[in-house]
Amino acid sequence: DFSEFVSARLAPLDCEALELFCIDANERIRFGKRFSAGDTQRVRVEPEEISRFLATHRPAGLVAAHNHPDSPAVPSDADDRFTAQLQMLCSLNNVRLYDHIIVGTDGTYSYFLVGRMEEIRRAFNVNNLIGGRICP
């Protein structure tokens, strides 16, 4: 399962890291990238960097995963804001955000598995904000 895969990659790290995984139309991982700032409390990735990543790799979908090296896998307010911002960036680029997984000292947290991903997808979707298609 994907949570076990990212846990094996992120749990051993001493600093917080974010990984983005490009998913193709057949729901297979095609590419992954790790972002890290060497900080135990946060990793900062600018929206422009994620936009470039999406434009370069053109995935059908995306899974985000990051770790809390010294704390439980409980999403913080900053994690919720990041997930909402990432969903909006994905929506603007016609990419489906499948999940955001947090790896902590007590296991993993999946926005998808607890049912929050669909709510975030609906709330932070460009079509919902502007009322559908843009027509001249």
What residue spans do the PLM features occupy?
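Active-site-proximal loop/helix of nucleotide/amide-processing enzymes and allied scaffolds
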Residues: 1-4, 22, 26, 36-131
